[in-house]
């Protein structure tokens, strides 16, 4: 090649790979009178041929003409489009709006009338109808309540609320599984008068074992096996007094009740084998009223609240009384029952001029 031929650069080689090469010619090598004078001429040089990739094409599908497709005929010569009555316009169907609304509106369900609410207590249904308030004389006779508690219990008994409690209790009693027996439900009121109460020990509900519940919280009749929770109470007394509290021969706490210790459960009945089965029967309304009245009337009391249920049951007390809280003595709790409530209660009573309780049992 001539000297004027330029060496192809990397860019030129790149163009060559694409099938086009460039040859740049200097203006001096161009002949005079040539129209390409005084300018750079770029001539394409064929490179390696690159065949284009053929593109596959398919012929357009032919679909049958739609009957409602627009036609090229004049509007006057077109055939009218037939519509179903459901899709006809308002000008074609006079009942168009009614049909559309009937199709769009959902079917209305018939209203369901729920029965009035019911109160279920221990498997017994108590309707919420208004009941006549029972008389104090009838209740005291049926349950064997002494007259010394009339001033406190009569206002709580002669109410429609307690009438519903009695209705629930009478319904549950038909099964024969209610503990304790009816003559022992108010046994806590037989051993001391209201003005003699100086210590209150609050329990949850009676023992659900046949023969254990006899109307006093935590207590069992003579001859019955001492329950585990009561054994832990005796162990706490042993820690407080040492040899001054020998192991009792039974779990009966009647000796405490005769000294003014009110052993009161929050709920007065239970179904056999089902703890806390009568919590919705309404006994707690009556027992709370008893504690509230005693707290207002009595000058000085020590109230022992063991467990969350007892603490929430008696939220407040007048400052003249001593409030003692601790975990429940049940064996299901991990915390040991090592409270010293018995010593603290006696100290509080003696400071007020009252006689201390003899916790020792026969």
Swiss-Prot record:
One of its GO terms (molecular function) is uracil DNA N-glycosylase activity. It comes from the Viruses. The active site is at residue 205. It holds the Pfam family UDG. Its main location: host cell. SMART domains: UDG (SM00986), UreE_C (SM00987). Keywords: DNA damage, DNA repair, Host nucleus, Hydrolase. One of its GO terms (biological process) is base-excision repair, AP site formation via deaminated base removal. Disulfide bonds: none annotated. Its EC number is 3.2.2.27. It is an enzyme of class 3 (hydrolase). It is found in: Host nucleus. GO terms for cellular component: host cell nucleus. Residues 28-97 are annotated as: Disordered. CDD domains: UDG-F1-like. It catalyses: Hydrolyzes single-stranded DNA or mismatched double-stranded DNA and polynucleotides, releasing free uracil. Belongs to the uracil-DNA glycosylase (UDG) superfamily. UNG family. Excises uracil residues from the DNA which can arise as a result of misincorporation of dUMP residues by DNA polymerase or deamination of cytosines. Therefore may reduce deleterious uracil incorporation into the viral genome, particularly in terminally differentiated cells which lack DNA repair enzymes. This is Uracil-DNA glycosylase. It comes from Psittacid herpesvirus 1 (isolate Amazon parrot/-/97-0001/1997). The lineage of its organism: Viruses, Duplodnaviria, Heunggongvirae, Peploviricota, Herviviricetes.
């Amino acid at each position: 090649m001539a000297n004027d031929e330029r060496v192809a650069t990397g860019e030129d080689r790149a163009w060559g790979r694409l099938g086009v090469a460039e040859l740049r010619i200097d203006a001096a090598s161009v002949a005079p009178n040539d129209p390409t004078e005084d300018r750079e001429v770029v001539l394409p040089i064929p490179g390696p041929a690159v065949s284009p990739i053929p593109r596959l094409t398919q012929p357009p599908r032919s679909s049958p003409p739609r009957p409602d497709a627009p036609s090229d005929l004049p509007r006057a010569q077109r055939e009218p489009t037939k519509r179903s009555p459901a899709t006809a316009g308002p000008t074609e169907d006079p009942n168009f709006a009614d049909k559309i609304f009937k199709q769009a509106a959902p079917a209305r369900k018939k209203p369901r009338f729920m029965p009035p609410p019911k109160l279920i207590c221990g498997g017994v249904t108590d309707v919420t109808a208004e009941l006549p308030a029972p008389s104090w004389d009838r209740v005291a006779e049926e349950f064997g309540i002494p007259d010394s508690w009339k001033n406190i219990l009569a206002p709580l008994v002669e109410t429609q609320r307690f009438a519903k409690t009695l209705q629930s209790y009478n319904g549950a009693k038909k099964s024969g599984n209610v503990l304790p027996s009816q003559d022992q439900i108010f046994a806590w009121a037989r051993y001391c008068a209201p003005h003699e109460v100086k210590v209150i020990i609050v329990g949850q509900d009676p023992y659900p074992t046949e023969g254990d519940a006899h109307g006093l919280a935590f207590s069992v009749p003579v001859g019955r096996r001492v329950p585990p929770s009561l054994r832990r109470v005796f162990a706490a007394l042993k820690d407080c007094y040492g040899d001054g509290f020998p192991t009792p021969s039974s779990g009966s706490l009647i000796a405490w009740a005769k000294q003014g210790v009110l052993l009161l459960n929050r709920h007065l009945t239970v179904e056999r084998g089902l703890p806390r089965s009568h919590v919705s029967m309404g006994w707690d309304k009556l027992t709370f009223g008893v504690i509230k009245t005693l707290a207002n009337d009595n000058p000085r009391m020590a109230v022992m609240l063991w467990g969350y249920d007892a603490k929430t049951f008696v939220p407040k007390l007048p400052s003249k009384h001593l409030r003692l809280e601790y975990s429940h003595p049940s064996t299901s709790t991990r915390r040991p029952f090592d409270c010293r409530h018995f010593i603290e209660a006696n100290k509080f009573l003696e400071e007020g001029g009252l006689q201390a309780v003899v916790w020792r049992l026969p």
